[in-house]
Structure formats: C-alpha cells, structure tokens
Amino acid sequence: MNKDNHHIKVSLTNNPYEIVIGKSSLESIGDELFNIGFREGLKVLVVSNKEVSDHYGDCIIKSLIKSKFKPKLLIIKAGEDQKNQSSIDLIHNAAYEARLERGSLMIALGGGVIGDMTGFAAATWLRGVNVVQIPTTLLAMVDASIGGKTGINHSKGKNLIGAFHQPRLVLIDPKTLITLPSREFKAGMAEIIKYGVISDLELFELLERQENISDLSNIKEKLLIEIIKRSAKSKAEIVIKDEKESGVRAFLNYGHTFGHVIENLCGYGKWLHGEAVAMGMVAVGQLAVQRGLWKEDNAKRQKRLIEKAGLPSNWPQLEIESVLSSLQGDKKVKNGKVSFVMPLKIGDVKLFNNISNKEIRECLQKIS
C-alpha cells in the first residue's frame, strides 16, 4: 500500500469500499486488489475505450498479471451515444467468453460512460459480479465512479435504465488527466463547482481564489489532488447517508434536472455532461433567486466561477414548451410536479417538489 495515497472510506452497511487517490496508483492495481481480498487465479475483464487503453491498458494488464490474476481486455466505443443496450451486449459477450463467474471481476478503465456501462454490465451479469472503477476523466473521478449508480440511456431519456451496484474499489490516479482533452477537463470542473455549492463553501472559495481553473497545466499537483479529494469526500459522505437516493442523495442532482433536458433536447454529443450541468446550475440559480431562496449576489458568484472554469453559462436556444415537456420525463417527477434542488446559500441546498410550470417559464424567459 502506497503511504502517499489518500484513502476515503465509503462506509456503507452492506458494501463498504475505499476510494484511493494517488500518483502512480495504476501500477499498483494488482496489489490494491490483493489488499481487499482478491486472490491469484481471479478472472478479470477490463473494459476500456481505445484512446484510454492505448495510454494505460498495458500498465493495468501487467500489474494484474504480476499479481497472478487472469485478465482479458475489451475495447469498446465510448461517448454518450454509445451508452446503450448494444454496448452492454458486447460486454456480456466478452464476460461469457472470459468465463467470468460470480466471484470474478470487471474493471472499468475510462470516463463516466465506460464506468456507467461496465457497472451496469457487472450488475446484470450472473445477477451481479464484482466491479472496480478506475476513472480517467475529472468528472468520473469526482462523481460518476463513486456511489454505485450504473446505467444506460433510453431513446426517451438519459439514464432511464440502470441499477445500483457499488464498486469494490475506486482507484484514482490524477496523472491520467494529462491525456484528457481540455474540454473534458473543464466539464469535470462543473461537478467540482457543484460540490462547492451544495456542501462545501471552503472548496467554492478555494476555487474562487485561483487565477486559473480552466487549464490543467496551470493547476499545481497539490491543488489538483486537494480538489479531487474534497469532491470525492463530499460525494462519499452523501452516499453513506443515502445509498439509494431516497433523501439527501438527491442533492447531487443540483443542476442536473435542467442539464438532462439540455442533453436530451440538443441531442447527446452536442454538449458534454459537465457543460450541460453548468448551464443547469445557472438556470436553477435563477429559479432560486426568483423564489427569494438565495441572494442574487450568490447567483452571480456561481456564474462567475462557472465562466472562470471555461464553461458555458448561457441557456441554449430551446423552445420553452419543449423544455417543460422534457422535464416531465425526469426520473424525479412525482404526481406531475418537477423537483429541483435549489441553493439556500453557497454550501447549502434543499430539495423542492412543488415547482410550477409558471415559475419555470418565468425563469427560462429571464435567462434566454
């Protein structure tokens, strides 16, 4: 175990695990698996996409072989438009060919899409095999890889098909961000800003104090690890309190209700998930101002920080009636009423279940 690694415990009653953050942790994946109880002869299916595998696939496979595991590597296409049943079939076919058993393991090596699909494939193969998440994008490191949400998209909406399936381990190696495209890095910053707004004022203010948070090359390694660690810890603490999203875990959807509408109406691929969430946060911030829940100055601070991160802050050109219709397809709608997580102050939010179409129209007219 590398003493320089940071360990965050996700202390769930039935499925506890750790988030391990540290440089060069990819090389030690075999040792980390041994530390949590896996033994030689373990059948492992590593799922990745070509771009990520070209950089890190050999390193992972060598570490697994060194620990006397039996790995197979599956390369599939990534991208939101690939997050479908056809991709799950590819993973299941590979699991069959690798003769995976219930005690076997799938490893998701990639961004949020690879993590979501591999997690869902693991949840549904043999009614559940082990999964380990090795996120290689900033967004996946601080959000998608933690908490056990897995799934794929449906033609009617994002993530409508899925399951809760907690990983056995989340392994985060910040050096993988070096090969991450600039736009993807900025998209990940949206989720980090989200954590600042929903639960961590100190993180929000830390980001405000930085001269540049939109370019990885201008962020010192110590700061990068700190913001990843704080964000991952925020996510873990919420998941511990509410594993299956029956209460406070809904706070993690801040900005996502409007964000999913943007992705759905604009078509998956037009905007990255983090970009859509950024615009969604600005929109719901305006909704909160309308309701008198938080001060306009806080909404402006949020928008400035989003723009500082190089993220879009202006609402896209969408028909308001189309937005209202799309909102009705949200998973969190109850009795026809749309729920929104809204800020009370920076570092504190609350879920509201009684938002009328009139209020939403007024908000969208204001920001359009």
Swiss-Prot record:
InterPro entries linked to this entry: Dehydroquinate_synthase, DHQ_synth_AroB, DHQ_synth_fam, DHQS/DOIS_N, DHQS_C
Subcellular locations according to the entry: Cytoplasm
Required cofactor(s): Co(2+); Zn(2+); NAD(+)
EC id: 4.2.3.4
Cofactor binding note: Binds 1 divalent metal cation per subunit. Can use either Co(2+) or Zn(2+).
Keyword Signal: no
SS bond partners: none
Name of the protein in its database record: 3-dehydroquinate synthase
Organism in which the protein naturally occurs: Prochlorococcus marinus (strain NATL2A)
